[in-house]
Amino acid sequence: DQSILNTIGSKLCKAILDQGHTLTVRPHYETVKRTPGVLQGLQANFSDHPKFNLILSMSENESLFRSQLLITDWSGISIEYSLGLGKPVIFIDLPPRVRNPKWQELGIEPFESWIRNKVGKIILPDDIDGISEKINEVISQTDQIMTEIKSIREQWVYNLGQTRNVGPKEIIKLLK
């Protein structure tokens, strides 16, 4: 698995914590299932740090609401987090997971790629030691990024604020 935690997780956590930032690690449930040793290593290395928190429960949401930003790779959580919560994202530029090796033949930029520079900033894995500067940059630009997120949300999220009224009607249509 080429995810953040499996490739640069420990280095990233150390860089964030060493700069005095609070860090909540919320691994994907597949990471919990497939590579528990990585998480045990993070727990062993950082559990005594007062600003480190590891959350393994997928039902816990409070940390998302309290957070200022998300750090991820190509995970879909970036779209949910940015468009759903209206908060910025820092993307670690790891190689994307490709499920369709012929995707480029379509001549369409994937939404996951298109949205990255609009809802946050991208940092190379080799630049992780400078993650604190990127965090501070994103936090200082939160208002600008939120304006862009709002525009994207209006363009791409249908029935925004009306799902409760529209959703059940559409489900009933499908059931007929």
Question: What are the residue ranges of the model-derived segments?
Answer:
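Structural motif
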Residues: 22, 68-69
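Catalytic binding pocket for nucleotide-activated donors in carbohydrate/polymer assembly enzymes
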Residues: 41-49, 74-155
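Short acidic alpha-helix that forms the nucleotide-activated donor recognition element
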Residues: 58-67
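Short beta-strand/turn micro-motifs composed of small residues
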Residues: 25-27, 72, 93
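C-terminal alpha-helical cap of glycosyltransferases
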Residues: 160-176
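Conserved catalytic-core segment of nucleotide-activated headgroup transferases in glycan assembly
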Residues: 1-43, 125, 159
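A structural signal for isolated positions on well-ordered beta-strands in alpha/beta enzyme cores
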Residues: 22-24, 53, 90
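Active-site donor-binding acidic/aromatic loop of nucleotide-activated sugar
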Residues: 50-57
